[in-house]
Amino acid sequence: MRYVLLLKGINVGGRNKVVMAELRRAVADLGYDNVETYINSGNLFFDTDKKPAEIVADFHDFFASHYPFVEAFSLLSAEDYATEVGQLPTWWEEDMARKDVLFYTEGMDKAGLMSYVDSLKLGDEVLQISDRAIYWGKYSESSYQQTAYHKKLAKSPFYKQVTIRNGNTFSALSNYLIP
């Protein structure tokens, strides 16, 4: 089965550097097949017959020994990803200043995040909560500083528990997962 592993917080601002070619080789050496990456932000694709729990355990061990600064990641099968794409909100196709997908990371307090997000008073923005992510759209760049996303969520402890991909990257990931 095809999977994507979305790493949090690598190659950002010159910190937590991971060379994608080295990562691909190391993951292939772990026994994963058809290993690919997309851009430098930690989008790792591979094939395996392993169960998700075994994959998560493998990568927790791998990152602890090779890249200890990688503390969080999200694992989705190609099927999971296709389900997410199939459930995109209608507003996702609208012209917006920003669109982000906040993927839940393995082991995070998902219920706590959902409760927190439900309590936010939204500004010039819209969101949809799904099983594996929160889709967040911001209508205007000029009002971005006033959005709940910027003013509240980005400053909350939950922000460190999600890994974020912008709308363009989210769309591009489909090319590696959905035939």
What are these regions (language model features)?
Residues 2-41, 45-179:
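Surface-exposed, charge/polar-rich loops and edge strands
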